[in-house]
């Protein structure tokens, strides 16, 4: 059968940085430290470069079939990704010397409630990118962690209104503890509440080229532990009350959240990182953002 990619001349010559496919539907079994291998449904991208200037194109079917083998016959881990990248290059000998595989998927994790004995599922968006260039493999991991952020300014303003209401109600009275507690338990007592919003920490890290396993769960857990207010799964009343307490004791502007995560990542063994904090404001019609990078030469840029 005719092979146009090999035999037909290019209409115009020139090298290309990446050629391949995107939005490939691909279920696969994902391996990560801390969980049993789990089947996820991903959208994949697969690319090689084209450094032969007069080549008509690449062999996309070879990339597709290599991913299909990864999906149906293997589990996704650093070793199998390295094998797939090597095949991308070897199957394009003379055409390509760089390759990329990217998976976007949601990782389901069981999450315990704060105080009750309940648990539920939470899904975490993950992007796993692997590349090879000049024989060197690089892995990059991106996760989104959703949490609640309560505005420190709004909390201060709410406290002031509560103080004013208290002074107005009891300005001329000697107050017993019982009366104070009863009043604080009414809507008249708590006349204002601070605003909070669902927020997302998007964190991207570069992994060591020699890793033998991915550890997505540890990255997610350490971020949630640092922020203190991750969005919950199963919730009973005691859990909701504890969540309210945690929000009140961990007030955060986007700058605060970014500095927390930056300080956390500095203690880890990642060669580089990039983070963006997104506070989807409930007061404003716009979002509040903060971005930070490790700052290594030639690394991620803000």
Swiss-Prot record:
Q: Which UniProt keywords apply?
A: Hydrolase
Say if the entry is tagged with keyword Hydrolase. yes
Which domain of life does the protein's organism represent? Bacteria
- Record EC number: 3.5.4.16
Q: Cross-referenced InterPro entries, in alphabetical order?
A: GTP_cyclohydrolase_FolE2, GTP_cyclohydrolase_FolE2/MptA
* Residues marked May be catalytically important (site): 151
Hydrolase recorded as keyword:
yes
Q: Which GO terms describe its biological process?
A: tetrahydrofolate biosynthetic process
One short Pfam family name for this protein? GCHY-1
Biological or metabolic pathway of the protein: Cofactor biosynthesis; 7,8-dihydroneopterin triphosphate biosynthesis; 7,8-dihydroneopterin triphosphate from GTP: step 1/1
Recorded GO terms, molecular function?
GTP cyclohydrolase I activity
- Its catalytic activity? GTP + H2O = 7,8-dihydroneopterin 3'-triphosphate + formate + H(+)
Family in the record? Belongs to the GTP cyclohydrolase IV family.
> What is the stated purpose of this protein?
Converts GTP to 7,8-dihydroneopterin triphosphate.
**Protein name, per record:** GTP cyclohydrolase FolE2
The gene for this chain is: folE2
């Amino acid at each position: 059968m005719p092979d146009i990619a090999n035999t037909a001349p290019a209409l115009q010559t020139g090298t290309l940085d990446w050629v391949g496919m995107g939005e490939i539907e691909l279920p696969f079994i994902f391996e990560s430290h801390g969980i049993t291998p789990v089947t996820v449904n991903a959208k994949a991208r697969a690319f090689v470069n084209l450094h032969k200037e007069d080549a008509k194109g690449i062999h996309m079917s070879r990339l597709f079939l290599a991913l299909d083998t990864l999906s149906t016959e293997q589990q996704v881990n650093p070793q199998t990704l390295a094998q797939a990248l090597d095949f991308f290059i070897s199957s394009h000998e003379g055409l390509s010397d760089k390759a990329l595989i990217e998976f976007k998927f949601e990782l389901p994790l069981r999450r315990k409630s704060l105080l009750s004995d309940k648990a539920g599922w939470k899904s975490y968006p993950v992007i796993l990118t692997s590349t090879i260039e000049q024989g060197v493999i690089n892995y990059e991991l991106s996760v989104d962690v959703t949490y609640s952020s309560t505005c420190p300014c709004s909390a201060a303003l709410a406290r002031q209104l509560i103080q004013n209401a208290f002074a107005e109600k009891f300005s001329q009275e000697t107050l017993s503890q019982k009366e104070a507690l009863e009043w604080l338990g009414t809507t008249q007592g708590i006349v204002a509440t601070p605003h909070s919003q669902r927020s997302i920490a998007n964190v991207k890290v570069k992994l060591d080229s020699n890793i033998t396993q991915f550890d997505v769960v540890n990255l997610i857990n350490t971020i949630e532990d640092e922020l203190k207010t991750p969005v919950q799964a199963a919730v009973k009343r005691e859990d909701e009350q504890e969540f309210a307490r945690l929000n009140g004791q961990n007030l955060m502007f986007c700058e605060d959240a970014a500095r927390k995560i930056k300080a956390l990542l500095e203690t880890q063994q990642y060669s580089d990182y990039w983070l963006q904090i997104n506070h989807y404001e409930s007061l404003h019609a716009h979002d509040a953002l903060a971005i930070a990078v490790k700052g290594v030469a030639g690394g991620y840029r803000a």
